Amino acid sequence: MYQFGIISSKLLLLKTIEIQIMPDDFTVINLEKHPTKDILDKHENGSLTVVWRDWDQIISHEPKMVYVSSVFPGEIKGPHIHTKRNSYFSCIHGNVVFIVKDKQGNYHEIKSNSDEPKLIHVPNMVASAHINSGNETARVLTLADIAWKPNDNEMQNITFDDYDMDKWRK
């Protein structure tokens, strides 16, 4: 747990952000989620999830590209390695399991969905994949420090031959 203090207009705001630093410096950050309210009768009408604020200091590589990808039920994106790019992922709709293979060959499984939002940082040269473990199309928000260009050959497809992806399929 880290506390960040911000002083602005005589206001001191302390926010505790839970950051799990994993092997090879990939990180899992539990994101803030706040209910939103109707302006007239104040009933709850949804929620707001904070993915990133410049003063949080949770993103160490400035994003140059932000995109949303979809993953159909039971389908897998990856596994692959980005040789230059650092990526930050958050499941914004549906259910996704992020599988990260550290440099010692150990697999780490991070479940993410919009009810319990997380931001997963996968640094360059670390293998990862994500699979939709739910019954509806999932959407993943990605922040990347290098913008994608056609034919840049920055991504290497690999296989997780010693990992059972089928356990997440329904």
What is each model feature region?
Residues 131-132:
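Asparagine-centered strand-capping/turn motif at beta-strand->loop junctions
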Residues 14-119, 135-170:
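Non-catalytic, conserved peripheral segments adjacent to functional cores
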Residues 128:
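Glycine-centered loop/turn positions within well-structured domains
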